[in-house]
Amino acid sequence: MKAAGLHLSLVVAVTSLTIECAAYEIETHQDLTSYAVGYSLLQTSRKLADLGMPWSPVDPDRTLPNSSGDRRTIVELFLDGAAFEDGFGCTDDRPRNHFFNPLNGQGLTGTILGFNVSGEPSPKWAVEQNSPATPGSRGFSFRDARDHFYRGTTRPARGDRETGLGLMFQTLGHVVHHLQDMAQPQHVRNDMHLDLPCVGPPLSDILN
């Protein structure tokens, strides 16, 4: 009985511990993206060489500009996109378009403190296919990535080509962020963990 009581006490003690969890943090998106790039065709085929870039995605001597003009390696551009997709502060509405209910095809719907909050379904926002929106108006969709790829392989000036290719890789990081969110329970169950519009901590902060 004493042994059983001690065992139960240990279980309670361990399960009561609180630890920092990065389940919904930007760093998690970057880690997942880094692994994805590491196991992608960019590492194992001639895809980059065929684009005129016969080097490793992590080569620090081979960089391209991101959307801020900072020179980054190819893998760093993916990581920038994965991080930037969550927006720049609580007034950025990009995160509200990261939800997708596979049962009904809807995006985010609901209210926060009486304010209606909604968003486009994540696949529609990320791909931007057959969208009435002006190309580039939402920024960093797969359609934008294709446009950047075209500019990066056709512009006569080297600087313009580098800018196009840099934005292409960063934009693919934005799209990968959506794929990751659609494999995360809150984003498919309409669970508003958003810090919108600056009304308090999201669920991830409470869990952490």
Predicted regions and their residues:
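Positively charged n-region of N-terminal signal peptides that target proteins for export
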Residues: 1-7
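N-terminal, motif-rich segments that launch catalysis or mediate targeting to/interaction with membranes
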Residues: 20-174, 178-181, 185-208
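Bacterial N-terminal signal peptides
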Residues: 7-16
